[in-house]
Amino acid sequence: MQMSYAIRCAFYQLLLAALMLVAMLQLLYLSLLSGLHGQEEQEQYFEFFPPSPRSVDQVKSQLRTALASGGVLDASGDYRVYRGLLKTTMDPNDVILATHASVDNLLHLSGLLERWEGPLSVSVFAATKEEAQLATVLAYALSSHCPEMRARVAMHLVCPSRYEAAVPDPREPGEFALLRSCQEVFDKLARVAQPGINYALGTNTSYPNNLLRNLAREEANYALVIDVDMVPSEGLWRGLREMLDQSNHWDGTALVVPAFEIRRSRRMPMNKNELVQLYQVGEVRPFYYGLCTPCHAPTNYSRWVNLPEESLLRPAYVVPWRDPWEPFYVAGGKVPTFDERFRQYGFNRISQACELHVAGFNFEVLNEGFLVHKGFKEALKFHPQKEAENQRNKILYRQFKQELKARYPNSPHRC
């Protein structure tokens, strides 16, 4: 009897041990399965935001190379230029969107990346030593977390010559090292940025817009130079590439992209049909309509909005240049550079458009593509020194036009 009881106890102990072993194996299996699922999720995440030491090291190496020399001084000696803070492989025969921005306005890059499918080149101006530090950190964070930035964007930095930019510590400023996605970087930038009134830098340094424009477009055979707070129509890059593939004889021609501004409460139009509907009810108007109507009037907006709808981008009509037209355009070949003596507000773009005219360029308005600025441009939104700067640059513009006569002595055109 006692033997039978002992056998039964041993049997139950063995059964209990077996059940416990099975339970442990099941827990181990579930743990491994969960770990595998988590690994798959991580792999999917890292496919979009590669965190490998190699990719981070490449970014560091690129920034270190660009910053190591201490930059080069511009022709005036007032600014320090760092080329290739970020680099990307660009086909010299592609159409590059070239733009410029203060550090605060870099947040507009997000919208440009969505609308412009081709390569971008942006020149960033840092007015202070702190902004120069922030610019290098932003370059590090954006290139680390934004695949589109790594693939399509070249970035250059300009700061006053008395400052030098340093290799960034990604932990400073603003804890950008804690971010894990491209959207988080742009969201963080929107929170730390302090957008102000146009050209109001709060320092004794002038915003070198033409230096920045030249820097952004200097490696491009074909470039559309715009302000960073403008947005191109959907498919504009594809349309321009198709035009370029069909005919690369753009030398001597400026393909004008009509520019508009939209009421800030309105959604940005994607295509011409949406834009025209808003234009007809006054929610969209010609660019600079409230500040300088003649500056864009030769585009002939009434003619443009009434063109028949077409699927292909093409030049629609030729417009003779007249002062003070300053269109946004795409051109190839030897395009005159922007005169870097013009800084801050006034005559910085018209001076280059004037030289295009004297050099013999033709101006042809595209039928479908366009640019839109978010918000109506109003005089009260500019800094108090605007008029003084405008008068100073007006005097320089008169001198510039006299210089063009000597530069193009055989040209029949004058501004």
Curated annotation (Swiss-Prot):
GO terms for molecular function: glucuronosyltransferase activity; metal ion binding. Residues 37-415 are lumenal. Its cofactor is Mn(2+). The chain crosses the membrane at residues 9-36. Mn(2+) binds at D227, D229. GO terms for cellular component: Golgi apparatus; Golgi membrane. Interacts with LARGE1 and LARGE2. This is Beta-1,4-glucuronyltransferase 1. It comes from Mus musculus. The lineage of its organism: Eukaryota, Metazoa, Chordata, Craniata, Vertebrata.
